[in-house]
Amino acid sequence: MSLAVEAVKDFLLKLQDDICEALEAEDGQATFVEDKWTREGGGGGRTRVMVDGAVIEKGGVNFSHVYGKGLPMSSTERHPDIAGCNFEAMGVSLVIHPKNPHVPTSHANVRLFVAEREGKEPVWWFGGGFDLTPYYAVEEDCRDFHQVAQDLCKPFGADVYARFKGWCDEYFFIPYRNEARGIGGLFFDDLNEWPFEKCFEFVQAVGKGYMDAYIPIVNRRKNTPYTEQQVEFQEFRRGRYAEFNLVIDRGTKFGLQSGGRTESILISLPPRARWGYNWQPEPGTPEARLTEYFLTKRQWV
């Protein structure tokens, strides 16, 4: 079986370009700085970073394409049959941390993984999704975000949105805090239940859907006035974001264990965060409502 790996790579490179262009237009001040890198074991990538923009305080949009021999533990613990195989992994991953606490943080990722087995068909799967982490959440934004997610899933099956929305709720959860990281979206991994071409079509829809879901929210909220107290709450919630990425996220573990580029992997961390001992928001405030209402498993559409 011949996989259209080059077509996937071309799509990912263009997706990185398109997302950076859309975010630069929304910021209106800062631009992404590109840092090309190579991986000693094979492959490389393009890291693009925006800092101190008018809207985006820190944003990273990464493309990577790495290959080599011998898979890291984070892959083989779920796929022991491919331990020691040659592998190829490529993807676009991004996290956007806006300056204004009324603009949510967003994350998106689309990727392809291929493992070559001698004398056998290659093992392949796609993964990815997108999700939203608001600080001062607005119901309209949450509904619209999930509506885009639901609409892009419909052509691929009646149950696809519900499955991948549920998976997102489960994955982006901090068990030791008993808190969700955000209001969810879509998450999928090990996607090979359809033919390669159909899986690739779905991944393309997810990549483009991220922009349709997120950019309008940025546009609506970026000029909302905010206070220093609200920035402090944003930084407190960013602490939770950092915890998830460092302690739980499989992508971070895979990148670090496979000898990936540390600066690119940790670009998802916020520029500033805070931790307070046993800090709790005042009852009845928007800060309390975030965890009590928005960060619970809800059917938004």
UniProtKB/Swiss-Prot annotation:
It is an enzyme of class 1 (oxidoreductase). Residues 49-58, 241-276 are annotated as: Important for dimerization. It catalyses: coproporphyrinogen III + O2 + 2 H(+) = protoporphyrinogen IX + 2 CO2 + 2 H2O. It is found in: Cytoplasm. GO terms for biological process: protoporphyrinogen IX biosynthetic process. GO terms for cellular component: cytoplasm. Its EC number is 1.3.3.3. InterPro entries: Coprogen_oxidase_aer, Coprogen_oxidase_aer_sf, Coprogen_oxidase_CS. Disulfide bonds: none annotated. One of its GO terms (molecular function) is protein homodimerization activity. Pathway: Porphyrin-containing compound metabolism; protoporphyrin-IX biosynthesis; protoporphyrinogen-IX from coproporphyrinogen-III (O2 route): step 1/1. Keywords: Cytoplasm, Heme biosynthesis, Oxidoreductase, Porphyrin biosynthesis. Its main location: cytoplasm. The active site is at 107 (proton donor). Substrate binds at residues 93, 109-111, 259-261. Involved in the heme biosynthesis. Catalyzes the aerobic oxidative decarboxylation of propionate groups of rings A and B of coproporphyrinogen-III to yield the vinyl groups in protoporphyrinogen-IX. Belongs to the aerobic coproporphyrinogen-III oxidase family. This is Oxygen-dependent coproporphyrinogen-III oxidase. It comes from Leishmania major.
